[in-house]
């Protein structure tokens, strides 16, 4: 029996129009349909349960704060760590090595950067880079720390100064000796 003949038979029995019969056969009253539900999706719900779930999905938030939320809570400022603050407005600070380790740099570079976790005299803990080839630092060594980040190593924003305190300079270095605490070579 086709759908049209079936509805016409029902109309004869109940004396209703086609629209009122089809609306009464829906799973929900017409008031709920007119209040925001999508009618074609509801009609497809008989065949497809996934479509039925999509028909009753609640609207999701857009991700922006409403005016009431802004009035109640306001905007939070992002706090960035200030690397100058660790040295306390000083050009250098003395500190004690807590740990000496290596760290791999960001892409595309490849190495093992030597770093030391240092507790400064103002009780701030920082990661400091140990420049040059080879070093004699170990736990409880005293070092002098200056500012200056290492671009490849995330979180390393200080440098250890070579040739001062317990960190020895690099022996037999000819060029850039002042940066690595190397002594002037004996002229022969």
Curated annotation (Swiss-Prot):
CDD domains the UniProt entry points to? Ribosomal_S12
Q: Which Pfam families match?
A: Ribosom_S12_S23 (PF00164)
**GO terms under biological process:** translation
Task: Name the GO cellular-component terms.
Answer: mitochondrion; small ribosomal subunit
| InterPro entries membership | NA-bd_OB-fold, Ribosomal_uS12, Ribosomal_uS12_bac
Instruction: Identify the SUPFAM superfamilies for this entry.
Output: Nucleic acid-binding proteins
The entry's protein name is Small ribosomal subunit protein uS12m
Species the sequence originates in = Oenothera elata subsp. hookeri (Hooker's evening primrose)
């Amino acid at each position: 029996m086709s759908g049209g003949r079936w509805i016409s038979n029902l109309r004869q029995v109940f004396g209703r129009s086609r629209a009122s019969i089809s609306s009464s056969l829906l799973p929900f009253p017409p008031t709920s349909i007119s209040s925001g539900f999508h009618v074609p999706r509801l009609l497809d719900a008989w065949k497809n349960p996934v479509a039925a779930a999509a028909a009753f999905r609640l609207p999701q938030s857009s991700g922006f704060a409403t005016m009431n939320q802004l009035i109640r809570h306001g905007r939070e400022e992002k706090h960035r760590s200030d690397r100058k603050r660790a040295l306390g407005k000083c050009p250098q600070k003395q500190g004690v090595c807590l740990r000496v380790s290596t760290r791999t740099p960001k892409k595309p570079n490849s190495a093992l950067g030597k770093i030391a976790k240092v507790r400064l005299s103002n009780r701030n803990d920082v990661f400091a880079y140990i420049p040059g080839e080879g070093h004699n630092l170990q736990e409880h060594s005293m070092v002098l720390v200056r500012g200056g980040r290492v671009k490849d190593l995330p979180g390393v924003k200080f440098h250890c100064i070579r040739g001062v305190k317990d960190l020895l300079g690099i022996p037999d270095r000819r060029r850039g000796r002042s940066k690595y605490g190397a002594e002037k070579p004996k002229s022969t």
